[in-house]
């Protein structure tokens, strides 16, 4: 059986960025990694209704900076910033260092695979037919400007006794083209028949040229030679 590589991991360092960006020695690495996991787990549970796509964590010296990518920043910030201040204190307590929380609004949630997958799972939990939920998500994503999308659901679909997998694709989804900007995410629907898994691939176009996940060093400026130019001679 053919297995598919994770579309984001294979593109790290080429056109994709890491969700955790920090350096640590051998003793601190495991502690920081576990701290990142706990922070993401807490935010996902606490902000389950805020349509969170992903969380980027940076660790400047003796502090932590968390950026929350969400389609509903108002729920994260709260009235006069009260909710985000509570989150900051809880994150600082979990990480053990002073915390800073930023929010980034996702303008087009139809092009975010995590939000699309969560939308499908919420419909499945409300007993919407899985084919209708899949086709509706595909149509909305293509209408928003995507070049291609693939949606896959697996489990006891429609309450069947034997689990199966069904998928629907529209447009192009080139998984092995490294310059292809493909986003991928998953979600789970907990129904009365069991768990139904949802996978979403979204192709947004090709990124041409060199795109690295770090700033390139500035080229040294060429010093102008003193003296008269040929025009002045």
UniProtKB/Swiss-Prot annotation:
Organism: Hamiltonella defensa subsp. Acyrthosiphon pisum (strain 5AT)
Membrane-spanning segments: none
Record's function text: Binds the lower part of the 30S subunit head. Binds mRNA in the 70S ribosome, positioning it for translation.
Family matches, as InterPro entries: KH_dom (IPR004087), KH_dom-like_a/b (IPR015946), KH_dom_type_2 (IPR004044), KH_sf_prok-type (IPR009019), Ribosomal_S3_C_sf (IPR036419), Ribosomal_uS3_bac-typ (IPR005704), Ribosomal_uS3_C (IPR001351), Ribosomal_uS3_CS (IPR018280)
A Pfam family that the UniProt record links to this protein: Ribosomal_S3_C
Keyword Lipoprotein: no
Example GO molecular function: structural constituent of ribosome
UniProt xrefs under SUPFAM superfamilies: Prokaryotic type KH domain (KH-domain type II), Ribosomal protein S3 C-terminal domain
CDD domains: KH-II_30S_S3 (cd02412)
Domain KH type-2 as annotated: residue spans: 39-107
GO cellular component, one term: cytosolic small ribosomal subunit
Annotated protein name in UniProt: Small ribosomal subunit protein uS3
Keyword line: Ribonucleoprotein, Ribosomal protein, RNA-binding, rRNA-binding
Subunit structure: Part of the 30S ribosomal subunit. Forms a tight complex with proteins S10 and S14.
Protein family membership: Belongs to the universal ribosomal protein uS3 family.
One GO biological process term: translation
Entries under PROSITE patterns matching the protein: KH_TYPE_2, RIBOSOMAL_S3
């Amino acid at each position: 059986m053919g297995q598919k590589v994770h579309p984001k991991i294979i593109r790290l360092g080429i056109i994709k960025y890491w969700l955790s960006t920090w350096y640590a020695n051998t003793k601190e690495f495991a502690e920081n990694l576990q701290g990142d996991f706990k922070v993401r787990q807490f935010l996902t549970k606490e902000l389950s209704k805020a349509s969170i796509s992903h969380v980027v964590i940076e660790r400047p010296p003796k502090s932590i900076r968390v950026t929350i990518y969400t389609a509903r920043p108002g729920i994260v910030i709260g009235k006069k910033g009260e909710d985000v201040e509570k989150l900051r204190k809880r994150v600082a307590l979990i990480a053990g260092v002073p915390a800073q929380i930023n929010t980034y609004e996702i303008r087009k949630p139809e092009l975010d695979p995590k939000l699309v997958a969560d939308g499908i799972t919420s419909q499945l939990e409300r007993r919407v037919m899985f084919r209708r939920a899949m086709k509706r998500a595909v149509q909305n994503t293509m209408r928003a400007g995507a070049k291609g999308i693939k949606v896959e659901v697996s489990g006891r679909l429609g309450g069947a006794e034997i689990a199966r997998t069904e998928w629907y694709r529209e447009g192009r989804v080139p998984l092995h083209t490294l310059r292809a900007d493909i986003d991928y995410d998953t979600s789970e629907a907990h129904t009365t028949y069991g768990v139904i898994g949802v996978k979403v691939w979204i192709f947004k176009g090709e990124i041409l040229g060199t795109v690295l996940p770090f700033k390139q060093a500035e080229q040294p400026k060429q010093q102008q030679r003193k003296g008269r130019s040929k025009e002045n001679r």
